Regions:
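Cell-envelope/extracellular polymer assembly enzymes that use nucleotide-activated donors
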Residues: 2-4, 35
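Acidic helix N-cap motif at the loop->helix transition within catalytic regions
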Residues: 14-18, 45-54
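Short beta-strand/loop segment that forms part of the nucleotide-sugar
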Residues: 32-43, 64-65
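A conserved acidic beta->alpha catalytic loop
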Residues: 40-49, 95-96
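Acceptor/aglycone-binding surface of glycosyltransferases and processive sugar-polymer synthases
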Residues: 60-82, 87, 99-177, 181, ...
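Conserved small/polar residues in nucleotide/adenosyl-binding loops
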Residues: 243-245
């Protein structure tokens, strides 16, 4: 199979039909052998009912459901494990990611022989104070900590070689750092593509101050593992030295 599109979602019932129609209209004319994988992360609205309805008559669709909300990392991990495509593309279900980017990402990761191509929402339609500025700070810190020159680590739309996502293990909150986990596993051909971003059409954002803080805490954890993972006693030696001083 050429392509798997993995779509994690939580309470996005209003956007599912429109998103599904748009993706299939694009991919049906592409000549690619593809599949769409929806992962409902414990939605409490009618999302799961909508997904079941669209899956009834479409053999390219599959869907999986968590009975409670485990977070985006776990939803992506479940979708990755079920994916069969040589290329795996992820995107959010809120219609802010543009399905027209799918084929461009697919072409870029193949022709440029990349392990990962990450989307970059260079022009964003989000709150400047509550999302744009925190996002810039977060991405600056992630670049410094990881050495990976990406401008939008948290962008939902990304393309991966299947060998990458089958190799790494996602834990809670680490979906933001898949490029870092991939680099640590030896997959270092990572690039980015400027992608179209749309204003949220339905519902409200699920990103808040708590997620921003958690993202930084996860980055600290990842930085610790990167620096001391193979020699953790070096950290404790440094820590004890500081205490002694």
């Amino acid at each position: 199979m050429d392509l798997s599109v993995v779509i994690p979602l939580y309470n996005e019932s209003e956007s599912i039909d429109e998103l599904n129609t748009s993706i299939n209209n694009i991919l049906n004319n592409s000549g690619l052998d593809y599949e769409l994988i929806y992962v409902d992360d414990g939605s409490v609205d009618s999302s799961w009912g909508k997904i079941k309805d669209i899956c009834k008559n479409q053999n390219k669709l599959s869907a999986y459901r968590f009975l409670k909300n485990y977070g985006k990392s776990m939803a992506l991990s479940a979708g990755f494990k079920k994916s069969k495509g040589e290329i795996v593309i992820t995107m959010d279900a809120d219609l802010q990611d543009d399905p027209n980017e799918i084929l461009a990402l697919y072409k870029m990761i193949n022709e440029d022989d990349k392990h990962i191509v990450s989307g970059w929402k260079k022009k964003r339609y989000d709150s400047i104070i509550f999302k744009n500025i925190p996002s810039k700070l977060f991405n600056w810190a992630a670049r410094k900590a990881s050495g990976i020159k990406l401008n939008d680590f948290n962008c939902g739309i990304k393309a991966y070689k299947s060998s990458v996502i089958k190799q790494i293990e996602l834990t809670d909150g680490m979906h933001r750092y898949i490029p870092v986990l991939a680099k640590n596993a030896g997959f270092n051909r990572i690039s980015e593509k400027i992608v179209q971003h749309h204003p949220r059409k339905y519902g409200k954002t699920k990103y808040g101050a708590d997620r921003f803080i958690k993202g930084f805490l996860d980055l600290l954890t990842l930085s610790f593992v990167q620096r001391f993972g193979k020699r953790p006693m070096h950290f404790f030696g440094l820590f004890l030295s500081l205490i002694h001083i």
